[in-house]
Amino acid sequence: DVPEGHYEEDNMKDTVVPNRNKIFSSIIQAVALSIAQVRGCDVDIAMGIHAGDHAIYPDCRQEFRDADYNAFKEGNWDADKVKYITPYLYGDKFSILEDGEFWCDKLGLDFDEVYRRTNTSYKPDAEGRSDYKSASSVERIEAFLKLGRRDPVEYIDGWKTAKKHVEQLLLNY
């Protein structure tokens, strides 16, 4: 079962998937290095890890990212052609949304259309609608509330219910 509540609660360690980001980074490093070698160019790779993840997920911390990148460089020829970008390492979900809002505007994209196509929920229903009680959903809704926007994804019981649930939950933090 996926625990419900805020990431500040002790039970959120149950959401940890051991070495998850190491697995992701190993795959993206291998692909990036292959592209760099075949095309003879440098490749930047980005990871969306953010400060909200640090307390629960050890592989989202700067120390882990540095150690992972150093191991990658030590273990591969031409690894210096691949650079890591972690633009949100010290930001939260709100800063990601704020950045997304800026770039959607700058690029002429419809913010709601872009974010309607994303899913943060750990417990979507069979129709793909987001829950609003798991920590990932709570954190997302909290960021949208801070941004002053309605989240365009569809929630199981609707936005009003999801918003009210998170507002009540946040009174405890």
Label each residue range with its predicted role.
Residues D1-Y173:
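Nucleotide-activated chemistry modules centered on ATP-dependent adenylation/adenylyltransferase
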